[in-house]
UniProtKB/Swiss-Prot annotation:
The modification Phosphoserine is found at residues 680, 689, 696, 742. This is Polymeric immunoglobulin receptor. GO terms for molecular function: polymeric immunoglobulin binding; polymeric immunoglobulin receptor activity. GO terms for cellular component: plasma membrane; receptor complex; secretory IgA immunoglobulin complex. PANTHER family: POLYMERIC IMMUNOGLOBULIN RECEPTOR, POLYMERIC-IMMUNOGLOBULIN RECEPTOR. Interacts (mainly via CDR1-like domain) with dimeric IgA. Interacts (mainly via CDR2-like domain) with pentameric IgM. One of its GO terms (biological process) is receptor clustering. Residues 19-645 are extracellular. SMART domains: IG, IGv. The Ig-like V-type 1/D1 domain contains three complementarity determining region-like loops CDR1-3, which mediate interaction with IgA and IgM. Residues 21-120, 135-237, 245-351, 352-457, 463-563 form the Ig-like V-type domain. The chain crosses the membrane at residues 646-668. It comes from Mus musculus.
C-alpha cells in the first residue's frame, strides 16, 4: 500500500471561549499530499444559517485574506483543491482541503459575517514531510488501547524455521516475541504469535493494549541467514481524534461510547481532562462526581461494549475535554481503549433561563415550568425522577400520553400548553420524600432536557389555600358545594377548580360559562372560590384541586378527595357549607319547643305572631270545662271545685300577660315595616336599607376608615374621587357573626317571652300541688 494514503491527523481543540460562539479545532496536523476536513460550528439562529461563511489566512500584519467563502469566492491557490460546504440543519460548515503542501502550514480563521472581522475561530494548520521509510514497508495505524495484528508471509522452505518479530531501536532490533514462546517483558500478556489453519506460508503477531511507546518500525522474520524471509512494518499509535460537540447552555449532551467487544465485560467510565490527569465523573461501579449529582446517567447499550452517558442542565464550567474508557477498576489505565470529545458550551443559548432549584413545604405544592422546542409543539412531554442508585435511571412519573404512577395518585398532573414552548408539572401534598432531582423530557429534540432540584422543608405556617374538610362525602342525587379560601395576595389571580384523573386535571367551568353539572363560582369579598356538584353522580367521586394561576403561569394548588354515597333511610346529609345555618335553625326551634305545656303535653308547631291568642283560648275553654264538671259533681266534686278556683285565679292573670305580649309583638312588627319603607328611599348615588347598618355602632363615626375593604366614593364639584384600599384586613370576631334585622330581633324577643311565660305557668302550677 502506498505511503501517501496514510495520514497523521492530530487535532487538538481549544478550551472554553467566551468571546465568540464560533467553535472548531484549534490545531490540525497532516502530511504532504494528504487532505483535511475542518468543521466549524455556529449558533442556531436564522441569521447565522443564511449569512456568509468564510475561511481566511492570517498574515504577519494581522490581516486575514479570504481563501474561500460560501458566496462562491475561491482564491487561485485553492483552485481545484478546496471547497466550503454549509450544513444549516446541523449549524456547521466544513472546509475541505486536498493535496496539502508544506506551504499550507499557517494560521487561519473560520468565521461568519460580511467581512473577515465578524465572529470567528482561530485554527492552526501544520503540514509535515512524509517520513522516509523503506519501499516495502507496510504501515499500520491504530488508536491507543486498541489491538493490531501484523501479517508476516514466508516461503514454504522456511516453514520449519523459527518465526519472530522485533522492534528496531537505533542500529539493533529488539525481540518482541518468537515461535519458541520467548517474549519481551514489555509485551508479556500483550503479544501473541500464531498461525491460522493449515496455511503454512503466513504467521501472525497480535499486540493488544497499544500505547504510544509501541509506535515504531518492526521486522517480522521466518528463517535464518540470507535465505530468511523478512518484512518491514511501521506501526503508528495515535490518540483518538476528538469529536466536537457544540451544545447550548442549559441543554443536554450525550456521549456515545463504542470500545469494542474485547472490553464488553469491563467496568465503564467517563472522565474529564484536568491538565495531565483525567478525573472520573461517573462509572458503572457507582462512582459519581458531586458536581453532576442529579443530572447524569450512564447506560449500557448492548453486549458489545457500547454505552452512553447523558448530562443535562449544561453549565459553562462543563465545557472541556472528555474521555470514555473501560477497565476493571473503573478508572483510566494506559493501554486500554478510549474515545475522546471536546465539548463547547454556547452561552448564547436558545433555551430559556429557568430556576434550577424549586422550594416547597410539606403539605404544599409546586408548579414547575418545563421548556421545550417551540417548533415541536406536538411532541410528547414527560417528567421523570432521577434516581442515583446503581448506574442511575430516571423512571417516567407522568406524560402527555402516559398515566400517572400509582403512588402519585391525586397529586401530580402535567398541563400541556402547545405553542408557547412551555409545559407545566404540578405536584401537591408534598412530603420530605419528594425532595430530589427531576427531569423535563420530550420525544423530540434531545437537547431540550432540563433538570430541576426540588427541596422540601417542614411547613411553619398554614397553607395559602385551604379546603375544609379534607375528606368530604357527597350524597348521590343531591347538590354538594365545597369552598376554597385564598389569601389577599391571590386576589388578582385567576382561581380555578379541576377534577383530577391519571391523564391530567380537567378544569371545571365557572358560573359565567353556563350552568353545568360541575361549576365554579368565586366570591372575591369573602375570598372564597366554591365548586358545586349539581346533582351529584357516582362519576363525581375522586380528587379535586383548587388552584390559582396568572395567565398561562400556574401557581399554588391544594387537593381534596370527595366520596359519593347513597342516602340511607333515616339519615340526613348536612352540607358543610350549610352546617352553621342549620345549627342556627335548630337553636331557634329548641327555644320555641321549650314553650310546650307540660300539663297538656301538646307542642305548638310553627309558632306565629298570634300563637299566644290560641293558647289563651285553649286555657279559657279548659277553665269552662272544669266549672261544668264542678256543678254536676257530688260532694267529692266540691273538693275539686276549690282546686279549680285556685287554678282559675292563676290562669286569668297569665292570660292577661300573654295578651300584653301579643300586643307588644304586633307593635314591633308595625314599626319594622315603617322603618323599612322609610329607609328604602334611594337617590341616583346611594341605596340604603336597614341591612346596611351592621349594628348600633355603625350609626356613629368609623374609627378606621382605611381598614374598610370597600371602595369609598365622594363627589366633589361634579367629579368622582375614588379611593380604593387594596389591603385586605380581617374583621373582628364579633363582626363575623350574622347581623340581625329588626324582624329577627322581634322574633327572638317573642321566643324568649314564650319561654319565660312557660316557666311562670309551670311555677304557678306546681305551687298549689305543693300546698
Amino acid at each position: 500500500m502506498r505511503l501517501y494514503l496514510f495520514t497523521l491527523l492530530v487535532t487538538v481543540f481549544s478550551g472554553v471561549s467566551t468571546k465568540s460562539p464560533i467553535f472548531g479545532p484549534q490545531e490540525v496536523s497532516s502530511i504532504e499530499g494528504d487532505s483535511v476536513s475542518i468543521t466549524c460550528y455556529y449558533p442556531d439562529t436564522s441569521v447565522n444559517r443564511h449569512t456568509r461563511k468564510y475561511w481566511c489566512r492570517q498574515g504577519a500584519s494581522g490581516m486575514c485574506t479570504t481563501l474561500i467563502s460560501s458566496n462562491g469566492y475561491l482564491s487561485k491557490e485553492y483552485s481545484g483543491r478546496a471547497n466550503l460546504i454549509n450544513f444549516p440543519e446541523n449549524n456547521t460548515f466544513v472546509i475541505n482541503i486536498e493535496q496539502l503542501t508544506q506551504d499550507d502550514t499557517g494560521s487561519y480563521k473560520c468565521g461568519l459575517g460580511t467581512s473577515n472581522r465578524g465572529l470567528s475561530f482561530d485554527v492552526s494548520l501544520e503540514v509535515s514531510q512524509v517520513p522516509e521509510l523503506p519501499s516495502d514497508t507496510h504501515v499500520y495505524t491504530k488508536d491507543i488501547g486498541r489491538n493490531v495484528t501484523i501479517e508476516c508471509p514466508f516461503k514454504r522452505e522456511n516453514a520449519p524455521s523459527k518465526k519472530s518479530l522485533c522492534k528496531k531501536t537505533n542500529q539493533s532490533c529488539e525481540l518482541v516475541i518468537d515461535s519458541t514462546e520467548k517474549v519481551n517483558p514489555s509485551y508479556i500478556g500483550r503479544a501473541k504469535l500464531f498461525m491460522k489453519g493449515t496455511d503454512l506460508t503466513v504467521f501472525y503477531v497480535n499486540i493488544s493494549h497499544l500505547t504510544h511507546n509501541d509506535a515504531g518500525l518492526y521486522i517480522c522474520q521466518a528463517g535464518e541467514g540470507p535465505s530468511a524471509d523478512k518484512k518491514n512494518v511501521d506501526l503508528q499509535v495515535l490518540a483518538p481524534e476528538p469529536e466536537l460537540l457544540y451544545k447550548d447552555l442549559r441543554s443536554s449532551v450525550t456521549f456515545e461510547c463504542d470500545l469494542g467487544r474485547e472490553v464488553a465485560n469491563e467496568a465503564k467510565y467517563l472522565c474529564r481532562m484536568n491538565k495531565e490527569t483525567c478525573d472520573v465523573i461517573i462509572n458503572t461501579l457507582g462512582k459519581r462526581d458531586p458536581d453532576f449529582e442529579g443530572r447524569i446517567l450512564i447506560t449500557p447499550k448492548d453486549d458489545n461494549g457500547r454505552f452512553s452517558v447523558l448530562i443535562t442542565g449544561l453549565r459553562k464550567e462543563d465545557a472541556g475535554h472528555y474521555q470514555c474508557g473501560a477497565h476493571s477498576s473503573g478508572l483510566p489505565q494506559e493501554g486500554w481503549p478510549i474515545q475522546t470529545w471536546q465539548l463547547f458550551v454556547n452561552e448564547e443559548s436558545t433555551i430559556p433561563n429557568r430556576r434550577s432549584v424549586v422550594k416547597g413545604v410539606t403539605g404544599g405544592s409546586v408548579a414547575i415550568a418545563c421548556p421545550y422546542n417551540p417548533k415541536e409543539s406536538s411532541s410528547l412531554k414527560y417528567w421523570c425522577r432521577w434516581e442515583g442508585d446503581g448506574n442511575g435511571h430516571c423512571p417516567v412519573l407522568v406524560g402527555t400520553q402516559a398515566q400517572v404512577q400509582e403512588e402519585y395518585e391525586g397529586r401530580l398532573a402535567l398541563f400541556d400548553q402547545p405553542g408557547n414552548g412551555t409545559y407545566t408539572v404540578i405536584l401537591n401534598q408534598l412530603t420530605t420524600e419528594d425532595a430530589g432531582f427531576y427531569w423535563c423530557l420530550t420525544n423530540g429534540d434531545s437537547r431540550w432536557r432540563t433538570t430541576i432540584e426540588l427541596q422540601v422543608a417542614e411547613a411553619t405556617r398554614e397553607p395559602n389555600l385551604e379546603v375544609t374538610p379534607q375528606n368530604a362525602t357527597a350524597v348521590l342525587g343531591e347538590t354538594f358545594t365545597v369552598s376554597c379560601h385564598y389569601p389577599c395576595k391571590f386576589y388578582s389571580q385567576e382561581k380555578y377548580w379541576c377534577k383530577w384523573s391519571n391523564k391530567g386535571c380537567h378544569i371545571l367551568p365557572s358560573h359565567d360559562e353556563g350552568a353545568r353539572q360541575s361549576s365554579v363560582s368565586c366570591d372575591q369579598s369573602s375570598q372564597l372560590v366554591s365548586m358545586t356538584l349539581n346533582p351529584v353522580s357516582k362519576e363525581d367521586e375522586g380528587w379535586y384541586w383548587c388552584g390559582v394561576k396568572q395567565g398561562q403561569t400556574y401557581g399554588e394548588t391544594t387537593a381534596i378527595y370527595i366520596a359519593v354515597e347513597e342516602r340511607t333511610r333515616g339519615s340526613s346529609h348536612v352540607n358543610p357549607t350549610d352546617a352553621n345555618a342549620r345549627a342556627k335553625v335548630a337553636l331557634e326551634e329548641e327555644v320555641v319547643d321549650s314553650s310546650i305545656s307540660e300539663k297538656e303535653n301538646k307542642a305548638i308547631p310553627n309558632p306565629g305572631p298570634f300563637a299566644n291568642e290560641r293558647e289563651i283560648q285553649n286555657v279559657g275553654d279548659q277553665a269552662q270545662e272544669n266549672r261544668a264538671s264542678g256543678d254536676a259533681g257530688s260532694a267529692d266534686g266540691q273538693s275539686r271545685s276549690s282546686s279549680s278556683k285556685v287554678l282559675f285565679s292563676t290562669l286569668v292573670p297569665l292570660g292577661l300577660v300573654l295578651a300584653v305580649g301579643a300586643i307588644a309583638v304586633w307593635v314591633a312588627r308595625v314599626r319594622h315595616r315603617k322603618n323599612v319603607d322609610r329607609m328604602s328611599i334611594s337617590s341616583y348615588r346611594t341605596d340604603i336599607s336597614m341591612a346596611d347598618f351592621k349594628n348600633s355602632r355603625d350609626l356613629g363615626g368609623n374609627d378606621n376608615m382605611g381598614a374598610s375593604p370597600d371602595t369609598q366614593q365622594t363627589v366633589i364639584e361634579g367629579k368622582d374621587e375614588i379611593v380604593t384600599t387594596t389591603e385586605c384586613t380581617a374583621e373582628p370576631e364579633e363582626s363575623k357573626k350574622a347581623k340581625r334585622s329588626s324582624k329577627e330581633e322581634a322574633d327572638m324577643a317573642y321566643s324568649a317571652f314564650l319561654l319565660q311565660s312557660s316557666t311562670i305557668a309551670a311555677q304557678v302550677h306546681d305551687g298549689p300541688q305543693e300546698a
